[in-house]
Amino acid sequence: MDTNTESKSRLKTFLDNPSKALWSLAIPIMFGMGIQTLYNLVDMIFIGRLGGNAITGIAFNMPLFFLVLGLTMGLGTGVTASIARFIGQDNKKEADNSAEHAVFMAVIISLSLSSIGLMFGKTILALFGAEGEILSLGWEYLHVMCVGMPFMIFSGFFRSILAGEGDMKFPMMVAGLGTVLNIILDPIFIFELESYGGFGLGLGVAGAAMATVISQVIVFSVFVYMLFVKQHSYITFRLKDFSFSMDIIWDIVKVGLPASLSMVVMAIGQGVFNKILIHFSADTVAAYQIAGRIDMLVFLPIFSVAASLTTLVGMFFGAKEYDSLRFTIRYGIMSAFFITVLSSTFIYFFADLAVGLFTDDELIISIAVTFLRLFAFVYPLISIGITTGRVLQGLGKGLPVLIITIVPVLGVSAPLAVFFIFYMGKSVEWVWYSMMVSTIVAFTIALTWLVSTIRTLPTVKLETNQ
């Protein structure tokens, strides 16, 4: 089967049964993200055995990694949407060229961020409020991660390219391989393992970072071999055919940059909240970090559905199949909502057991459980915001995601938290209340924007001249 026929066949399969198509894309993503989430949970359990300061040191790194993740995933979403629309238009040449531009962008971003991290990382951690042993532990972790950052960024872009053509299984299998390897290497690099003959390296938090970097190098190597040597994908990479185009760069950036900036805003917000929470104690920051890891588990299926929506919406929009487009949007968002209702119920009743996996410190457990039980009431609203944003990205609209993030995070939650804590002298629960209010604001903006956008779409597929 030639590549054009393959493209048409995949699009037709998706159109024949959009709901089945959604899950055929989402389940492999869910599997891969599930393994990654398992790693994040296990990693935190291992680091938790090093003490509360180790958890807090890693917590101060999270805004920086959220920034890197934001740029990679945000621009990656632009890549996915661009490739999906070109495939929907049956334009393989431009789909290939879009993928090649993505690789070009990965080179620039990875080298820039890695260099900045190595030169200014410790200073940035200090600006976030880390000091003393916490600053030392945070920098131990960060400087190792910066060395491996290019491999992580490239792998993220490769996944986005494959997602654009509807291939979710292979990238998630590769990510799963890296995660399993990471879980195996973590205890070897972190602990001395005296009970097992002392063959562990005992490198502490730096060891956790080394285990991650090694696994990401292997993931990157597998992607390069399969995409450039074995030519596994529908997309083909040929340097001689590469034609630099500002139109393609703009097509990616107009969707991806607002998404990236939205995650940058979230990273800044997380840094602000770390600084607010350290006002109470290092244990409060540690509790927030643990609760955040459990959050990831709650939203695992939601991010999977959302990623699938970007691909399907992009393809259906490019093919002008508006009835299928509307059905897919409605079905995907409602599926995410009901899944989150179930997971929220579970979290509310079993939050103490979940947090107890990470630490036996009663104060940390108490703070984290309070956070989770409060947020169980707004998780379903967050799921609608996440899926709505990815739908709008699939339609080629990146700005809404940025607005949906900036207004609640910098305009609502952070100012409210600062006011309640530093001016009103309220307890830490008022930080959580501030976040919950911002969640309701984000939900309202997202839903309003989506409804108004859908109303502008034609009611039937537009006829084109043959």
Describe these PLM feature segments.
Residues 20-80, 84, 257-277:
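Signature of the first transmembrane helix
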Residues 1-26, 83-150, 198-257, 313-378, ...:
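Short alpha-helical transmembrane segments in multi-pass integral membrane proteins
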Residues 55-115, 152-171, 288-351, 382-404:
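Small-residue-rich hydrophobic transmembrane alpha-helices
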Residues 24-40, 144, 155, 178, ...:
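Transmembrane helical elements of multi-pass membrane transporters/channels
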Residues 76, 145-163, 171-179, 208-221, ...:
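Short runs within selected transmembrane alpha-helices of multi-pass transporters and secretion channels
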Residues 52-63, 138, 142, 282-297, ...:
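Small-residue hotspots at the loop-to-helix junctions and early N-terminal turns
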Residues 67-70, 182-186, 220-224, 297-300, ...:
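Hydrophobic transmembrane alpha-helices of multi-pass small-molecule transporters
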Residues 34, 38-56, 125-132, 188-203, ...:
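Helix-terminus/linker motif at the lipid-water interface of multi-pass membrane proteins
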